[in-house]
Design a protein with these regions (language model features):
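Non-catalytic cap/lid and distal C-terminal segments of serine-dependent acyl enzymes
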Residues: 1-178
Length: 178
């Protein structure tokens, strides 16, 4: 597989944005399979970035020889949401990134049945949020997903300040009740 590191100016985020892409080797994929290539979005966990899956897993080795495009975007600690502090990661992922990638990779599928999403921890939260709120993904997988905030207390988790959590999700009383 080819490992591509892409940085482009995101109109939604109003900044340069980093995305890693694993792309099938042309010599390992039949010509007929080079059209409408399935795509998997892999979302990193908290404190990770678009390099996490490549550095901490065998994803590249395991997918070698397959006909699958793997997209690994960076959202810092933005929880794959449109944050209160101005970074609209949800909108960037749900709307902008697939269109940008389609321009880079015209043979990448646009079909829901061939588009998948998975994530680790914070990325598990993001993948279910994106899969349930859009009609883009046919399958979603959450690995140790941060899916329940009912008993969550930022103070007890040592995971950022209350101001950080308000910046991502708004007032704590509102998002723990949702």
């Amino acid at each position: 597989m080819a490992v591509m590191k892409i940085e482009y100016y995101s109109q939604v985020l109003d900044m340069e944005w980093g995305v890693n892409v694993l792309y099938p080797d042309a010599n390992r994929v039949e010509e007929a399979d080079c059209k409408d290539i399935p795509v998997l979005y892999l979302l990193h966990g908290m404190s990770g970035n678009h390099n996490s899956w490549l550095k901490r897993t065998n994803v590249e080795r395991l997918l070698r020889g397959t006909n699958l495009i793997v997209v690994m975007p960076n959202t810092s600690n933005g929880w794959y949401t449109d944050t209160q502090y101005g970074f609209d990661y949800y909108t960037a992922l749900a709307e902008e990134l697939p269109e940008v990638l389609k321009r880079f990779f015209p043979n990448m599928t646009s079909k829901r049945e061939k588009t998948f999403i998975a994530g680790l921890s914070m990325g598990g939260y993001g993948c279910f949020k994106l899969a349930l709120a859009t009609n883009r993904f046919s399958h979603a997988a959450s690995f140790s997903g941060a899916l329940s905030f009912q008993e969550f207390s930022p103070e007890s988790q040592n995971l950022g300040t209350p101001a950080y959590w308000r910046g991502v999700f708004g007032e704590i009383k509102d998002w723990t009740a949702s």
